A protein has these predicted regions:
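Conserved donor NDP-sugar-binding/catalytic core segment of glycosyltransferases
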Residues: 80-122
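Short aromatic/hydrophobic "clamp" motif used to bind/position activated sugar donors
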Residues: 73
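Acidic donor-binding loop of glycosyltransferase active sites
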Residues: 338-339, 407, 523-538
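Acidic donor-binding segment of Leloir-type glycosyltransferases
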Residues: 15-53
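Short, flexible, basic/aromatic active-site loop/helix in glycosyltransferases
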Residues: 105, 110, 122-148, 163
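Glycine-rich, basic loop-to-helix element that forms the pyrophosphate-binding segment
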Residues: 51-68
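Conserved catalytic-core segment of nucleotide-activated headgroup transferases in glycan assembly
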Residues: 271, 275-280, 284, 295, ...
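A short, conserved alpha-helix in the catalytic core of glycosyltransferases
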Residues: 85-91, 142, 146-166, 171-202
Length: 543
């Protein structure tokens, strides 16, 4: 209503920042008296509805939505300015899962402070704009999550669901609480309401109706809150918390969810090493099983694109200087809510297990990836280096202490399970799969059409460096003598200079390859070789 300048700038921001998404713009003009009456003459390519009388906010929205032709309806206040690439993330999220009925944006004030990262509704019907006036870049505001509601300044709903619900409930005429009510209706109809932090919208707030709740249209905010409480009192009592109690759970609707904390050396670089791929796939599993998942990388660095991938998956990743310094405070504050802690690797787990035991009542799972003491013992047997034997003994004590301190220890190989039981029969240890496969595409092998050999391994792992050096110096000369045209491709992230220098016309050091490129190598090479002289655990390159 009126405020032409805001409406014009809002539409300008849509046109500039929406990418190649197909959309229509419907301007719902609620009987304005300013230049808005001529907006369709000023801005072309929009569909403008000029109400003959003032319908007020709620009925204006319901009336305009009848004209929408798209698969989704996005309600956007005229006192907003959308930011770069705001629209595609909303669509990508709602299309990810048929059970998602409505999605909403991260709202920020014009001065850059956060206005809302999803809303919280308490048992008494009162509401919080979660994160209000905080830094919008903090980790806790930047992962996909369920929300009690998203403020109606920027929400998108499936059109079919909107029509099934019947639009905004007119008991909340003229405005206020209709967005919260819509979110509850979405859940009543079996769907979820989700917050998408990658969609950022600046909201000026209060431009049309002001901010004084004692007079004017804004006064309906208080009246409608009472109506909202009356309508949803049973739902609020059963599935929401008392006012200001445990916002850690309330902010993401995890009142009835199990919360799991995963700890590893850094955010999993799932396309660069086997251990990271394992961690990533188990994170996916826990999210898909309905856990609320938190992740700490011991370096507290937001490696990209990996951190963004986890956040879009629904994992809250703790990173940055604050958490690097205060992770124990975070555990102390929220430990009562954490039901499970999944610790990875001995050199990382030893730093965290005492704090986990002190500040939480969580069941502790330790995943060793491999037995370090067994790997170093095997390297000693190969090289005769006495320092490795001492190191193996040191690792054995550390690893055994962790295994016995955990509620359950897992390894990817029955060999590790057996080795532990030989020295500690009382240990609770089991073998579990290193990788989780689903929807595996069938491949026509045609070995007669294939040629060449390949080796894949991340070179941050010492046995892989040794393997390639041994291959180059001991095996390749005999292989080339027998097959002069043979090609052996060495694949894997971060090959050191000592590996790069081994390259010949027969031994090709390719370094990092994408998953798609790796698939091509697997389909075109005749044999995948594993010239490891020592190691432990399951070799991802074999699986």
């Amino acid at each position: 209503y009126n405020q032409f300048e805001y409406t014009y700038l809002c539409i300008k921001s849509i046109l500039e920042n929406s990418g190649d998404v197909a959309y229509e713009i419907i301007i719902a003009d609620d009987c304005s008296t300013d230049l808005t009456t001529k907006i369709d003459e000023i801005i072309h390519g929009v569909h403008t509805i000029h109400n003959e009388s003032n319908l007020r906010f709620l009925r204006n929205c319901n009336n305009a939505a009848k004209q929408a032709r798209g698969q989704y309806i996005l309600f956007l206040n005229n006192d907003t300015q959308v930011q770069a690439d705001w629209l595609a993330p909303l669509i990508e999220l709602i299309e990810r899962d048929d059970s998602i009925g409505m999605v909403g944006s991260k709202l920020v004030y014009p001065d850059g402070r956060l206005q809302e990262a999803g809303g919280i509704l308490w048992q008494d019907g009162s509401a919080w704009n979660y994160g209000n006036r905080a830094n919008p870049d903090e980790p806790e505001f930047n992962y996909v999550k369920e929300a009690d509601y998203i403020s109606g300044a920027a929400i998108m709903i499936r059109k079919s669901l909107w029509e099934e619900i019947g639009g905004f409930d007119e008991r909340f005429v003229p405005a206020y609480c209709e967005d919260s009510d819509l979110a509850f209706e979405v859940r009543k109809h079996g769907c979820k309401v989700m917050y998408q932090p990658k969609s950022v919208v600046v909201h000026f707030e209060g431009i049309s109706n002001g901010t004084d709740t004692t007079s004017g249209q804004k006064a309906y905010q208080v009246t409608n809150q009472k109506k909202f409480l009356e309508k949803w009192q049973q739902e609020l009592q059963e599935n929401h918390l008392p006012n200001a109690v445990d916002p850690f759970r309330a902010r993401e609707r995890s009142v009835h969810k199990k919360i799991l904390l995963m700890v590893d050396h850094y955010v999993p670089h799932y396309d660069k090493d086997a251990g990271s791929r394992t961690v990533y796939q188990y994170l996916q599993l826990f999210v898909n099983q309905g856990f609320s998942v938190k992740f700490i990388g011991d370096n507290f660095f937001a490696h990209q694109p990996y951190t963004d991938t986890l956040q879009q998956m629904g994992v809250e990743v703790l990173y940055g200087p604050y958490y690097a310094k205060h992770w124990k405070d975070w555990q102390k504050e929220n430990g009562k809510d954490i039901g499970y802690v999944f610790l990875n690797r001995p050199h990382i787990s030893v730093k965290y297990i005492d704090a986990v035991r002190e500040f939480t009542n969580a069941r502790v799972i330790y995943y060793g990836h491999d037995l370090h003491f067994l790997r170093e013992k095997r390297e000693y047997e190969l090289t005769g280096d006495a320092a490795l034997l001492q190191s193996s003994a040191d690792w054995e004590k550390k690893e055994l202490d962790l295994i016995l301190a955990a509620d359950m220890a897992y390894y990817p190989s029955y060999v590790e399970e057996q080795a532990i039981h030989e020295i500690a029969p009382q240990a609770k240890v089991k073998a579990i799969p290193a990788y989780l496969f689903s929807d595996v595409e069938e491949c026509e092998y045609h070995f007669d059409k294939r040629k060449d050999l390949m080796f894949i391994g991340g070179f941050g792992h010492r046995p892989n460096v040794d393997a390639v050096k041994w291959l180059a110096n001991e095996i390749m000369p005999a292989l080339v003598k027998k097959l002069p045209d043979i090609r052996v491709y060495i694949l894997g992230s971060n090959p050191p200079e000592e590996v790069k220098q081994l390259a010949t016309e027969n031994l090709l050091i390719k370094g990092f390859v994408t998953d798609e490129e790796l698939q091509e190598y697997y389909q075109n090479c005749r044999i995948s070789i594993v010239p490891l002289r020592y190691g432990a655990g399951i070799k991802g390159k074999v699986i």
